[in-house]
């Protein structure tokens, strides 16, 4: 069977008239409130009847007639007597009453026996024990749906602790779904029942002492309003309390007496204000109210009047659809007979299929006769009255408009002065240098002060900074109370706690936190002994003195071996005149003692040498030395940068395990801080051992403030356990402090608020906005960077100063001085052994210096100062070997004419190395020094003459 659907605006015409009365459709309404000014139920029924009868589409002459009966009291006897008066009139349905649960039960039972439809408009009572008749339909939303809606709101606000105030014992049954939700989630829900005095003051005081911020009130509208007024007298109507009223008419109450409009008051409503007739309906009730009840202002239509209006339309719509399929007739019934209405069951089936939009929203019933597929509007109290911020639908659940809810809170924050509790702690909050000359918030500066300014600019609120009385962050006492800033928030003495307040699970149970504005962890701060700073000769540090000594010995050993090997191998001896092979008996060896010492130096300095080894043995020595120098130079270069730039630190511990495994270094944390709580509650074995040590150590290793802990670190063998942000701050300002290891945990700093504060979401959004704009990072850099110590994580190349590499300049200067001194000695030595002249040594020195200063040509005559040595006695010719010449060093040199060669060599005294085996032979071979006599074959006169000419061709 298709569902019956009809618009409420234009009701279709009747197709068939009822048999017993072709001109009327009779409905009975029972009202239990005879005062018209109280609810307007009589007027609403009249408005519905007249609107239906005036419908232009109505066909025929049938009209709707509503007979109204009044109950003076909630009496079963009076109710039964009234029903016996209604049944003989031949009604198609009975409406009401709007209250009186006992009367409603009697009416439902009688209608069920006679199979006459009954519409209930009152809240259901005794859900567990009341039997719902098939003929009974309830237009009022069920308490089960309301309890589910309340649970959804609590879940939306993340509420884990609440209190339920019941006006009657039946509320525990009516709100069973809500209680079951708390049982499943294991959250805390305390239930308090009003006593017979109906005075809610004692209950409210208990709730205030328990610090419960969310209060659910299940009572009628008048009692709910009374409870709210009493709460205002006790100071419980503020921004830290949330009230949820289950009564659907609470939004009609006047809130003029509320002083603090920041309180979060939520209620429900099912009025469909978008209905075309709603405004006319409300105006009609208002006009009637003004005529009959001018002593009380009109606040809005009562829910029962709107439900009765919709009930009339639902009955007419169902009768219309039933007449489409069959002709129905209504006959009088009697309480004294067992006769029933034969069309009652059919009409009930059509009533259960009705779907229409009424003054109370969508009207539809389920198989149990309860209203379904409708929505409860969620209202929030504002400065301008109640405003819808969401809805709860039977099928779709809760849907909240967070934007509207947040805007209401923003309006509440606008121009509101919040009390901020805080604590003096660098760099979060500090007194200015001239704070005595200032007052109010201007006395303070720091990270938290700047952050408060940013938040106040975004949320448009005012604030007053106040230092916490006991100077601590907050720890629980043995009696359950809290100290410090946490205690002030619990006592509602402050609105915000802005400081380095750590978010912990224990604190989260008693106060609310915003999202963290800074992430950190526990770290270890310790004093270090700085090693020796890089000095002038720090370029020698990459190698130890022993290595330098062994390198010197290796150099001398290689030089000696090279000199020995070069002398032994015949391949290092060669003719200085390769173009005159066979005609010159001179052999030259380039590895003199000086060259043997110079060649390793060139290889070690990676500059090379003009001396190249010829023999395989000398090349082997050279290759081994080069490989040795390659490794040495590479190792030196790799370590040089570190030794020139890094100032090594002497730290006896490197991790938290090292700290826990020793007893020489004391360690502790701030007493009453979150770090102390962390070690106290930790289950990690290492941290448990550390807590046992700190707890039992005497004298105490706990400190009262961060400054005291820093002073103890600097003045004694003490390691301080504190947050990493404070660690970084003090390390930036004292280079003797360092962090040991990494973080022991991860946590955050948040803004503390009293439980239930409606401002938390607003501050969360503001903090996220500051983080996205990088404002918090900018503020941290402003207050953390001290500039005294470089960042440890900065690995960029840094310029070296004279204190790092000054020693190499000293070596260079000393080398230059030694070279100048040696040049002077060589100059004097040459003058002493030159041919004698009349010029003195000093004059020669002055002349040479003048030519150096004037940059004259590098050509001057040979110096002669020393007396000419007497000629050597001629060697007897019979003692001279034929075809050889004797040099001054005793070596023999072959020549064509011995006398001429000897005379030539005597004249070229500068070319003869006295006491040595070397001599320069020709211009092309000036580098060849070693001369060695070898057997000379018989030569012709032409060969000897050519050699003579060749050896005598060297210029002066």
Curated annotation (Swiss-Prot):
GO terms for molecular function: kainate selective glutamate receptor activity; transmitter-gated monoatomic ion channel activity involved in regulation of postsynaptic membrane potential. The chain crosses the membrane at residues 546-566, 624-644, 805-825. Residues 1-20 form the signal peptide. It is a multi-pass membrane protein. Residues 863-889, 931-956 are annotated as: Disordered. Residues 939-948 have a biased composition (Basic and acidic residues). InterPro entries: ANF_lig-bd_rcpt (IPR001828), Glu/Gly-bd (IPR019594), Iono_Glu_rcpt_met (IPR001508), Ionotropic_Glu_rcpt (IPR015683), Iontro_rcpt_C (IPR001320), Peripla_BP_I (IPR028082). Keywords: Cell membrane, Cell projection, Glycoprotein, Ion channel, Ion transport, Ligand-gated ion channel, Membrane, Postsynaptic cell membrane, Receptor, Signal, Synapse, Transmembrane, Transmembrane helix, Transport. Glycans are attached at residues 158, 220, 272, 286, 323, 408, 415, 479, 736. GO terms for biological process: modulation of chemical synaptic transmission; synaptic transmission, glutamatergic. Ionotropic glutamate receptor that functions as a cation-permeable ligand-gated ion channel, gated by L-glutamate and the glutamatergic agonist kainic acid. Cannot form functional channels on its own and produces channel activity only in heteromeric assembly with GRIK1, GRIK2 and GRIK3 subunits. This is Glutamate receptor ionotropic, kainate 4. It comes from Pan troglodytes (Chimpanzee).
